[in-house]
Amino acid sequence: DDGELYAFITKENAPGHFPYTAGVFPFKRTDELSARMFAGEGEPERTNRRFHYLSQGQDYVRLSTAFDSVTLYGRDPARRPDIWGKVGNSGVSIATTDDAKRLYSGFDLCNANTSVSMTINGPAPIILAFFLNAAIDQQVEAYLAEQGKPAKLLDTAYRGELPEGHNGFGLATVGRRGDEMVDADTYAEIKARTLQTVRGTVQADILKEDQAQNTCIFSTPFALKLMGDVQQYYIDHGVRNHYSVSISGYHIAEAGANPITQLALTLANGFTYVEYYRSRGMDINKFAPNLSFFFSNGLDPEYTVIGRVARRIWAVTMRDMYGADERSQKLKYHIQTSGRSLHAQEIDFNDIRTTLQALL
């Protein structure tokens, strides 16, 4: 009846309409079944081979980068022989821009069908700089090839054989700097175009690190300043397709929080970033679209509505408290099945647990 219809419109609403309880977009994408497997092991070339294996036959390249503990804590593996056993363990070792060039070589980082996720927090601004410079230098390489002046690969560009599907793109600038290979005006043009095109996400959520995971390498105030500096750089250079932070509840849940506490702390962290960025004079509609979220899933009943509640709270607050526009009101998130829920005992049931979480 009319009453039920009114209740649906005001409380449930249709996808793509404020407050986006049922979804921020009116329709589900039909051109892609997104697959983004977390990957990272050993040296950059080894993970690069893994990336190419995972991307075989895929129309859309979705790379999710796992870094080793040495990288997560911002250490230089070349200077620490005492931690040799940790280098490349459970993630890829990245310490230079050349490492990033090798890691993502063979993938056009400016292709509209390519997106890169990087799970890094403490040293996130530095790793992000490696990534962006790798993307820029890729386009310098492409420009030189178009001009009939292809750069010659150095012998040290890539250790080992190129994997299947690897065309060598991105390796010609290994050991070189793109700004030294073209004139200043050309480089500035390539850089501007690259920054406005490159797609992906860097986690960089330092508040949840303090609360749950603790891969902090700076004090919280200084880490927040770095986050603000990165976001201001995004605004100044028109970086619109790359998310400067993935505000994460997953790690909070893995540390022991129930679904309600996970959501409360994650939204609180998100609004803290909003307040901090605004205190630095940033326009909310220029930075809010660069914020993304990441939640854990489990078998608790509250997980069935965690995304719906999050979208609604975010949309109402952004509109009514901050006067944000429609794009800024839309909370976009990724959700992942819980590792904490998996047991060593009766391990065969873990497949069932994960399947049920995925269905939720």
Regions found by a protein language model. Give the residues of each.
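Catalytic alpha/beta active-site cores
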Residues: 1-306, 321, 329-336
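A generic alpha-helix surface/boundary motif
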Residues: 129, 312-313
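Long hydrophobic segments that form regular secondary structure
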Residues: 307-310, 318
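Flexible, glycine/threonine-enriched loop-and-boundary segments that flank and lead into catalytic domains
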Residues: 315, 338-350
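Catalytic-core region of carbohydrate-active enzymes that cleave or remodel glycosidic bonds
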Residues: 347-360
